[in-house]
A protein has these predicted regions:
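Active-site-proximal cofactor/substrate-binding loop regions of enzyme domains
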Residues: 1
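Extended alpha-helical scaffolds
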Residues: 12-168
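Extended, amphipathic alpha-helical scaffolds
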Residues: 161-334
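Conserved small/polar residues in nucleotide/adenosyl-binding loops
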Residues: 339-341
Length: 341
């Protein structure tokens, strides 16, 4: 018979060997999982890239539909959009939404609204406005077609620092703006103006605030979009009479007065030093600011308004209107686009 002490030693050894085997097995499984992680990430990345490429191809298809529409209008004339012809364009507008082109869809809606109004009252202002919308639409078609085609050919589906993404209908996420280096820390903003308007083409209210960055003197804007269907879910912005202190300020791609946003802020009272600082950022010469505005606004895709600060010598009446004069005597009609240099 085998002695009891030998049997106990064997049992202990078998138990120890089993534990070591279990540990080795667990380690092997962990290593296998770790090795699979890059594969899983790579697979997810490929799937995401494929989805983005598919979306770009879909957008390009929609762009060609819009391009054909513009060509038809240019061939037959804007007036053909009125009366019975408008239904065709309304149908096209709905289609553009299916091609991830909500920005282009919005422009088509603006065009339709102006031509409907022209068909009713025959006022030239509607026809002229429609012509501007048509030019803006055609510019967006050409630039976005070129941009998206280049993305496909280079196999690059990453987001870029370009305003085209938003103008086509994309919605920027804060982390995306941060990844592009479009965020800066510790900004102080003072609101200079606030306005609420109704966007008939988008069936939404837009709260717009114009702010000055007290650190740089740059004029920036906030936009809060409130669709009519979701008014009870989206809080309306309001006038701000204090200095807004922002830990991280995100700036959207674009020209002129860039759009900004932030998550979380604190406030402090406005001081005399703040007002003096705002005044120090004002331009001395109207002619210089007019040149800047013209260079920005000549781009058909630029915002329709450009904000700037001008130090004036005098503001007085000119007929039934007001005019601003700088220290050189150069003037501009306030509230109008009539410039006298």
């Amino acid at each position: 018979a085998i002695p009891d002490d030998i049997i106990k030693k064997r049992e202990k050894k078998q138990s120890r060997d089993k534990k070591e085997a279990d540990i080795a097995s667990s380690a092997g499984e962990a290593d296998a999982d770790s090795a699979d992680e890059p594969k899983k990430a790579k697979t997810a990345s490929k799937a995401s890239k494929a989805a983005k490429s598919k979306k770009i191809k879909k957008q390009l298809e929609g762009i060609e539909l819009a391009a054909q529409m513009v060509k038809n209008i240019l061939k037959s004339g804007l007036a053909t959009m009125g009366a019975g012809g408008v239904k065709t364009y309304e149908q096209l507008s709905k289609q553009l939404g299916d091609y991830y082109l909500s920005g282009m869809q919005h422009l088509v809606n603006e065009l339709i609204i102006e031509m409907k109004a022209f068909d009713v009252d025959g006022k030239d202002e509607h026809y002229d406005a429609a012509a501007v919308k048509l030019e803006r639409l055609w510019t967006l078609i050409k630039k976005s077609r070129e941009y998206l085609t280049a993305k496909l050919e280079s196999d690059d589906t990453q987001l870029d620092d370009t305003q085209l993404y938003e103008q086509l209908g994309g919605v920027w996420k804060l982390e995306e703006l941060r990844a592009l280096g479009l965020c800066r820390s510790n900004a102080e903003l003072l609101q200079l103006s606030f306005d609420v308007s109704y966007d008939d083409a988008g069936k939404q209210y837009i709260d717009e605030g114009c702010y000055i960055d007290l650190g740089s003197g740059e004029l920036v804007c906030t936009y809060n979009y409130r669709p009519v269907k979701a008014l009870k879910y989206i809080r309306q912005d309001d006038s701000v009479f204090h200095v807004t202190q922002v830990g991280e300020l995100a700036m959207y791609p674009g020209q002129g007065n860039k759009r900004v946003r932030w998550n979380g802020s604190t406030t402090r009272a406005v001081t005399k030093e703040d007002i003096d600082k705002v005044r120090s950022f004002a331009a001395d010469y109207l002619s210089d600011e007019v040149k800047k505005a013209k260079n920005i606004l000549k781009n058909a895709l630029a915002p329709e308004i450009y904000y700037t600060l001008i130090r004036y010598e005098r503001i007085g009446e000119c007929g039934e209107r007001l005019a601003l004069l700088d220290k050189t005597g150069a003037s501009i009609m306030l509230g109008l686009s009539l410039i006298h240099i």
